[in-house]
Swiss-Prot record:
Coiled coil, from the record: none
Composition skew (Basic and acidic residues), residue ranges: 88-98
Compositional bias (Basic residues): 516-529
Positions where Phosphoserine occurs in the chain: 72
The protein's name: Uncharacterized kinase C1B1.02c
Source organism per UniProt: Schizosaccharomyces pombe (strain 972 / ATCC 24843)
GO biological process per UniProt: NAD metabolic process; NADP biosynthetic process
Molecular-function GO terms, alphabetical: NAD+ kinase activity
A cellular-component GO term for this protein: cytosol
């Protein structure tokens, strides 16, 4: 096709775009988002991927008078031979044309059905970050100060009142008994009295009583809806804990022996979803699966999570349960340090072939990994990878594992992925048994948006799982959008150092286990004392 003819087709597509928008606005049933829901925050966040250029008027430069969407004309699908269809991954232009028919610009809206108003575009402009520096030296100094601020925030010690504690344990006898023992200790022997260094901080919080009353009224209304026959006992703001245990444990004898009973309540998944701000902290007892369950229960806001291990320490459950009295006493009185672990926000987009658009079926937050595999199919699957709407490659394998830094020591390392410290915000992509020997795991920054598409000419469907939960089938044309979640997982750690992660790496995975060349414990303790004395000086 000549360049002149292609330009005319683009102009024709731009002219007919507004007419298609007007027709689609009258058909509310085919829109890719709910008009009754306020989509402005979502549009403001996701519209940066659109190809838009504006022509502001001389009078109002902040408002856009005309918007033009630049897009390639819809391509016509040409029949291809069976060999070319199976080896279409080498034709990047064909993949780009195919993605033009199935890609979207906003997670809850399709490009052909998006009506962008001047106010929303102006809001998008105002959210941009502008930095001014007189020279390169000032810019370097600014970057250094930002890194120093991030380092201090990661090492900051927090201290606030804990009153309502949610307990999560594994479904085994030892974990349940340990959880009940910990709950009884909190109810009987522990009384929260903040130290003098934290009295000023606690007294300066004038909104604490208001927030308590709001959360109590929220919980009261929820309990009346879910448990209409139960008598609601209001919470009195004293130095006593209110313990929430799982409702499935209510009939056990060890749970019925807890006292006082007015401070023992039971939680459900609905309560965690609808009232996430009700709980001050979450305590998990068991292994790493208990901490993953806490992340799955709180899809948005997550309270600080303390993870105790009943057996061998894991990468999430690093606190030994045998020392829970000492650990909790230090945390509640002297404060604690939180490691904000990155989570993914995964959006499932269903392809509507009748209207050549997509609809968002659901969103899930994952702490470990998103797994896409071939499921029960006996042959490998084809997946198209796009980063920021740019075609990267077509992967032919048994599946792909998209992991967070926290999940780099789980399924990802078994798939050949790299180990990544949880303090590094990154997206790890590892193929599962790839057909091409040249495919290597890749690490992307968390600022990018990854899209994994099941091609329209794929041989079979794919299956996906989110942290081992909620297994879903992906049809032809469907895809998943992966981006960094706005709600990280706050994991309570004992110190600001990364000593725990490296110790567990050596203990659990036997990382670089060559005993003849490892330093002795005496040498390591001497180095630790030297570093501590240097910091104190």
């Amino acid at each position: 096709m000549e360049p002149g003819s292609k330009l005319s087709e683009d102009e024709t597509f731009s002219q007919t775009f507004n007419e298609e928008e007007q027709e689609d606005s009258r058909n509310k049933d085919i829109l890719a988002f709910d008009p009754s829901v306020d989509n402005e925050p979502l549009l403001t966040k996701k519209l940066s991927s659109l190809s838009i250029y504006s022509e502001p008027s001389p009078d109002e430069a902040s408002n856009l008078q005309e918007l033009k969407f630049v897009s390639s004309p819809p391509s016509v699908r040409v029949p291809r031979s069976r060999r070319n269809r199976r080896n279409s991954r080498v034709d990047s232009e064909a993949r780009k044309r195919q993605f033009d028919r199935v890609k979207h610009s906003v997670s809850n809206s399709c490009k052909l059905h998006l009506s962008l108003q001047g106010q929303e575009a102006a809001q998008l402009r105002s959210d941009s970050l502008y930095l001014e520096a007189s020279d390169k030296r000032d810019l370097t100094s600014l970057v250094t100060r930002v890194k120093e601020l991030a380092r201090k925030l990661s090492a900051a010690r927090l201290a606030f009142r804990f009153r309502k504690v949610l307990l999560i344990c594994n479904d085994n006898k030892e974990s349940i008994e340990r959880s009940v023992e910990l709950a009884q200790w909190l109810l009987d022997t522990f009384s929260f009295t903040p130290s003098s260094s934290h009295n000023n901080m606690a007294s300066s919080n004038t909104q604490s009583n208001t927030q308590l009353s709001e959360m109590e009224s929220e919980e009261k209304s929820f309990n009346k809806d879910v448990y209409p026959n139960d008598e609601y006992t209001p919470f009195t703001p004293k130095n006593q804990f209110v313990i929430y245990l799982e409702d499935t444990l209510a009939s056990l004898d060890v749970v019925e022996s807890l006292s006082p009973k007015k401070n023992v309540r039971f939680w459900t998944s609905e309560l965690c979803t609808q009232c996430p701000n009700l709980f001050d902290c979450v305590i998990t007892v068991g292994d790493d699966s208990a901490a993953l369950r806490a992340s799955w229960l709180f899809q948005d806001v997550v309270p600080p999570v303390l993870s105790f291990s009943t057996a061998k320490a894991g990468f999430l459950s690093i606190l030994p349960i045998a020392e829970y009295t000492k650990t909790l006493d230090l945390i509640f009185h002297r404060g604690f340090t939180v490691n904000l672990r990155m989570r993914f926000q995964c959006s499932i987009m269903r392809y509507v072939g009748e209207h050549s658009t997509h609809i968002c079926e659901g969103q899930y937050s994952v702490l470990n990994e998103l797994l896409i595999d071939r499921g029960p199919n006996p042959f490998m699957i084809s997946l198209d990878l796009y980063v920021e709407n740019e075609y990267i490659t077509t992967l032919q394998s048994d599946g792909v594992c998209v992991s967070t830094p926290t999940g780099s020591t789980a399924y990802s390392v078994a798939a050949g992925g790299s180990l990544c410290h949880p303090g590094i915000p990154a997206i790890l992509i590892s193929a599962i048994c790839p057909h091409s020997l040249s495919f290597r795991p890749i690490i992307l920054p968390d600022s990018m948006t990854l899209r994994i598409v099941v091609p329209l000419d794929a041989r079979s469907n794919a299956w996906c799982a989110f942290d081992g939960h909620h297994r879903i089938e992906l049809g032809l044309g469907d895809y998943i959008s992966i981006s960094a979640s706005s709600f990280p997982f706050p994991s309570v750690i004992r110190s600001k150092y990364s000593k725990d992660w490296f110790d567990i790496l050596r203990q659990t995975l036997n990382w670089n286990d060559r005993k003849g060349r490892q330093r002795s414990s005496r040498y390591k303790s001497h180095v630790h004392k030297t570093n501590t004395s240097e910091e104190q000086n």
